[in-house]
Swiss-Prot record:
Record gene name: nuoK
Quaternary structure note: NDH-1 is composed of 14 different subunits. Subunits NuoA, H, J, K, L, M, N constitute the membrane sector of the complex.
E.C. number(s) listed in UniProt: 7.1.1.-
One Gene Ontology term from the biological process aspect of the record: ATP synthesis coupled electron transport
Record PANTHER family: NADH-UBIQUINONE OXIDOREDUCTASE CHAIN 4L, NADH-UBIQUINONE OXIDOREDUCTASE SUBUNIT ND4L
Entry-linked InterPro entries: NADH_UbQ_OxRdtase_chain4L/K, NUOK/Mnh_C1-like
Keywords: Cell inner membrane, Cell membrane, Membrane, NAD, Quinone, Translocase, Transmembrane, Transmembrane helix, Transport, Ubiquinone
Name by which UniProt lists this protein: NADH-quinone oxidoreductase subunit K
Enzyme class: translocase
Organism classification: Bacteria, Pseudomonadati, Pseudomonadota, Gammaproteobacteria, Thiotrichales
GO CC annotation terms, alphabetical: NADH dehydrogenase complex; plasma membrane
Length: 110
């Protein structure tokens, strides 16, 4: 079992993967359990991206390559843009409909 050394902190690859899987499972549970609130759905999707980024960093550090960090940088940039656009859409929907409950927003009204 290899250990990742980060500034005098030694984390094994197994522990990192368990953490990443736990983040991913929590985000999937958030999506499945709470389908009504659009903000919780957006946060769960961002948590999923965080789990994927953690995997990239773990495997890049394990193989001692910098490409994982580069991928994480670009994914974080895209995720930030996605979050900004998603929150802008949520604010626009809330201003027009006065709710963010997805069960009340499923009708196509003008």
């Amino acid at each position: 079992m290899r250990a990742l050394k980060m500034n005098s902190i030694s984390v094994s690859v197994t522990h990192g993967l368990i953490f990443s899987i736990l983040l991913f499972v929590i985000s999937v549970a958030g999506i499945i359990i709470n389908r009504r609130n659009i903000l919780i759905l957006l946060m769960s999707i961002e948590l999923m991206l965080l789990a994927v980024n953690t995997n990239f960093l773990i495997f890049a550090n394990m193989h001692q390559q910098a490409m994982g960090g580069v991928f994480v940088f670009f994914i974080m940039a895209v995720a930030a843009a996605e979050t900004a656009i998603g929150l802008a859409i949520v604010v626009a929907i809330f201003r027009k409909r006065k709710t963010i409950d997805l069960s009340k927003l499923n009708t196509l009204r003008g």
